């Protein structure tokens, strides 16, 4: 099916983007899953919720992490199940700003969608920054060469 990427937005963006970066103490304010066919999947406040679109990649504004272990069928299944659902403002504030686990099954926010699509439990607990860290670590582990067992 081709390689899937986690795209992390680091551009200046809107006031909302800047507030997310400030609160999470991160350079990232948004994330998307980029499929091999060029579609970008996420939940976007600007687009009103869960959607697919094509975005012209500008590496000044986006960092990409390959996700070779991602299951495209699982991602598409979750997308089809949630496509058109609204943006989860309450869940975003409740799980990212307060120590609450709010899970609205009718709405999602960006990192919640991406984490759920990648199969992570408690997807609403992930910020774009935390999801990027976890995916980067999984990528490093899954692409590491075989260890020399004599040194184990």
Annotated model-derived regions:
Residues 6-67, 93-104:
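Glycine-rich catalytic cores of cysteine/serine-nucleophile enzymes that process amide/ester linkages
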Residues 95-152:
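Activation targets extended, charge/polar-rich intrinsically disordered C-terminal tails
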Residues 35-39, 71, 118-121:
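Short glycine/proline-enriched coil/turn segments at helix->beta-strand junctions
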Residues 71-92:
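A structural motif
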Residues 1-27, 128, 132-138, 149-152:
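Donor-binding and catalytic core of enzymes assembling or modifying cell-surface/extracellular glycoconjugates
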